[in-house]
């Protein structure tokens, strides 16, 4: 078997990102929880393979599939801009097991005020860790911005949960089960824009098809943040809407009435099953490398691009996650 060529572009995902299927395959790989079980030595081995290949050195005997596997293992554990190893629960591969546990508990312990407050706080604490761990190298999150977003999102989530909880007291019990979802949706609408407030102030980089940076756009930032908010809310819908319907039916049956202790693990399991599919599929709703027509950009930036490169009609930007 001959040595691998050096023209495999491991800077980009393996599958075509212009199609939903290609994006879904990419995110199923990125969010694979099995990556959490890899040892430090395995992570370092993957980092060496990737860094050597980018430097023009092919690891002897490696196949193309092994190269791509190393690339995805590397991406799952190391920050793309800083190269630092991301804390375990901040990695994309931790999304399913962590959200499974937290969401399952939010849906199980929704009746009493102290448990509502506690699990909404846990959820926003986890979100803060994920957002900080995956912060952008272009627009890094300051401690103050992180704190503001964290406190605001937690306050918004708790206020929404407690407000709706009081409003649903006289409604059918099933309605009360959806209060945690409303709280999470409200928190996402607060947390993500605040966490990325610098992008809303100075814009995010936009580039031509070849990757040549053309400037910064606040309009592109708004579009990207909106897409991320929609993705995050859609991601929560299956896990926070389907299990309550199933549990409401099961809790009326003798099986769970005789074994109430099974309620929490069963709910967590149902949430996990939904998240295994919802997380990658909702991450794939919009292309990571999104596009916007220059006619929709700010007038100054549009004029600047026309002056630099009159043939450019569409620019691209990284929408974030």
From Swiss-Prot:
The keyword Acetylation appears for this protein: yes
Membrane topology: Multi-pass membrane protein
GO CC, alphabetical: mitochondrial inner membrane; mitochondrion
Function statement: Mitochondrial serine transporter that mediates transport of serine into mitochondria, an important step of the one-carbon metabolism pathway. Mitochondrial serine is converted to glycine and formate, which then exits to the cytosol where it is used to generate the charged folates that serve as one-carbon donors.
Subcellular location: Mitochondrion membrane
Protein name stated in the entry: Sideroflexin-3
Gene that this sequence comes from: SFXN3
GO biological process: mitochondrial transmembrane transport; one-carbon metabolic process; serine import into mitochondrion
TM region positions: 146-164, 174-194, 226-246, 266-286
GO function term, MF aspect, one: transmembrane transporter activity
The entry's keywords: Acetylation, Amino-acid transport, Membrane, Mitochondrion, One-carbon metabolism, Transmembrane, Transmembrane helix, Transport
Organism for this UniProt entry: Homo sapiens (Human)
Upper lineage: Eukaryota, Metazoa, Chordata, Craniata, Vertebrata
Chain positions with N-acetylmethionine modification: 1
């Amino acid at each position: 078997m001959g040595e691998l060529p050096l023209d495999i572009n491991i800077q980009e995902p393996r599958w075509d990102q212009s199609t939903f299927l290609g994006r879904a395959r990419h995110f199923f790989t990125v969010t694979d929880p099995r990556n959490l079980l890899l040892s430090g030595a395995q992570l370092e081995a993957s980092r060496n393979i990737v860094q050597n290949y980018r430097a023009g050195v092919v690891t002897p005997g490696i196949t193309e599939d092994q190269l791509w596997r190393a690339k995805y293992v590397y991406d799952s554990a190391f920050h793309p801009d800083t190269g630092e190893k991301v804390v375990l629960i901040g990695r994309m591969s931790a999304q399913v097991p962590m959200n499974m546990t937290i969401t399952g508990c939010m849906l199980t312990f929704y009746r009493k005020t102290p448990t509502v407050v506690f699990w909404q706080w846990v959820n926003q604490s986890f979100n803060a860790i994920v957002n900080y761990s995956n912060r952008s190298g272009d627009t890094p999150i300051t401690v103050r911005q992180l704190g503001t977003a964290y406190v605001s999102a937690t306050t918004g989530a708790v206020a929404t949960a407690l407000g709706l909880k009081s409003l649903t007291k006289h409604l059918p019990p099933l309605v009360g089960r959806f209060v945690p979802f409303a709280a999470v949706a409200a928190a996402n609408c607060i947390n993500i824009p605040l966490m990325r407030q610098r992008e809303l102030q100075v814009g995010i980089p936009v580039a031509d098809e070849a990757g040549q940076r053309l400037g910064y756009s606040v309009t592109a930032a708004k579009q990207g943040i909106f897409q991320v908010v929609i993705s995050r809310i859609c991601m929560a819908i299956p896990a926070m809407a389907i299990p309550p319907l199933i549990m409401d039916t099961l809790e009326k049956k003798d099986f769970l009435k005789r074994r109430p202790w099974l309620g929490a693990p069963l709910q967590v399991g149902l949430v996990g099953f939904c998240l295994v599919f919802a997380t990658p599929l909702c991450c794939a709703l919009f292309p990571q490398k999104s596009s916007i027509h220059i006619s929709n950009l700010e007038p100054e930036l549009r004029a600047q691009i026309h002056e630099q490169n009159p043939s450019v009609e569409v620019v691209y930007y990284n929408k974030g996650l």
